[in-house]
Amino acid sequence: MAGFFSLGHGGGGNTPDNHRTNTNNPSSSGTESWLWCRNPNSNADGGEAGPSYKGTLELWQHPNNQEIIFQQQQQQQQRLDLYTSAAGLGVGPSNRSLIETSGGALMMMRSGSGSGGPSCQDCGNQSKKDCSHMRCRTCCKSRGLDCPTHVKSTWVPAAKRRERQQQLSTGQQPQQLGGSVPKRQRERIPARSTSMAYTRIPSNNTSGLEVGNFPPEVSSSAVFRCVRVSSVDDEEEEYAYKTAVSIGGHVFKGVLYDQGPAERSSSGGGSQPLNLITAGPSASSSSPNVSCNNGVVGSTSDHYIDPASLNYPTPINTFMTGTHFFSNSRS
């Protein structure tokens, strides 16, 4: 049986007063008190040792109130450090009072650690600045905590964020929703009449013709090919004739459209004002020397120009300046 003997006072006598058990005997002078402990059972397995050698003497220091308070504070600080390190894994003390009391200390520690804002105690993400539970919106909602700061979501789509960043980088203010955006006006091209406009060069005025070696009037034979054409506005097809002649070393191609009966068109000059082909009696439709075979109108004269022999590239379409646009010829 262990016995405690106080060593706080002087005197080494063997009186019964000095051998009484003392468990709470602080020194009167305020200094540390020591206890002398005798444990007779410590050498019970010591073999054949004599009874006078059984037992040991130990010195125990009696703690005062300040040391007890310091130990309690140190243990609480260790628990707070453990709770802080395990907060990201969702591990923490089960005592709710400890969580509530340590919230203020954790808030001070986190606010002083950096300016990036507090982190969520459950997932480790950034929490709201004004959240009293120090959690993000998802964790507050999943735990069912009554947090007034997480009522409205602050999530913004990535497209709007990029648009706002571009506006801020360029210095442009975001346009209001009700503002009108100016639209580009469509260019309106006036519709051309079905009748072709042309200007006949007078024969007496030869200014500019000598430079290009173009005579004012040409009489030659040509091959007219019958084709079917249709306008953009009107889907009705009509017959026309296209040809190509060589004048002054240049190739001239054109399309002759139907102008009506010969009696009405003869007064207007027929197809001669087009200046594409100014042929003689052999090229006139009323001449008896002209024959039409399988849609091909040709002259009976042996002197004619074959368009294939000119080695001129085939045009993409039959569009000419000053005329209507027609689709590609169909046979």
Curated annotation (Swiss-Prot):
Note down the stretches annotated as region Disordered. 1-50, 158-194, 261-290
Give the Polar residues compositional bias ranges: 21-32
A molecular function (GO) held by this record is: transcription cis-regulatory region binding
* Residues that coordinate or bind Zn(2+) 2: C120, C136, C140, C147
* Compartment annotation: Nucleus
- What NCBIfam families does the annotation carry? LRP1_Cterm, put_zinc_LRP1
From what organism does this protein derive?
A: Arabidopsis thaliana
What Pfam families does this protein's entry cite? DUF702 (PF05142)
Q: Which UniProt keywords apply?
A: Activator, Auxin biosynthesis, Auxin signaling pathway, Developmental protein, DNA-binding, Gibberellin signaling pathway, Metal-binding, Nucleus, Transcription, Transcription regulation, Zinc
On assembly, the entry states: Forms a heterodimer with LRP1.
| Segments of the chain annotated as binding DNA | 120-147
Q: What happens when the gene is disrupted?
A: High gibberellin (GA) levels associated with dwarfism, short hypocotyl, narrow leaves, reduced apical dominance, and late flowering, but more flowers.
- Give the compositionally biased regions (Low complexity): 166-180, 278-290
Q: Briefly, what is this protein's role?
A: Transcription activator that binds DNA on 5'-ACTCTAC-3' and promotes auxin homeostasis-regulating gene expression (e.g. YUC genes), as well as genes affecting stamen development, cell expansion and timing of flowering. Synergistically with other SHI-related proteins, regulates gynoecium, stamen and leaf development in a dose-dependent manner, controlling apical-basal patterning. Promotes style and stigma formation, and influences vascular development during gynoecium development. May also have a role in the formation and/or maintenance of the shoot apical meristem (SAM).
Q: Name one GO biological process term.
A: pollen development
What this protein is called in its record is Protein SHORT INTERNODES
Q: In which tissues is it expressed?
A: Expressed in young organs such as shoot apices and root tips. Present in roots, stems, flowers, leaves, hydathodes and siliques.
- Asked if the Swiss-Prot or TrEMBL record annotates the protein with the keyword Metal-binding, the reply is yes
Does the record carry Transcription regulation as a key word? Answer: yes
Q: InterPro entries, alphabetically?
A: SHI, SHI_C, Znf_LRP1
Q: Name one GO cellular component term.
A: nucleus
Record-listed Zn(2+) 1 binding positions: C120, C123, C131, C136
Q: Where is this motif: Required for homo- and heterodimerization?
A: 247-250
Q: Member of which family?
A: Belongs to the SHI protein family.
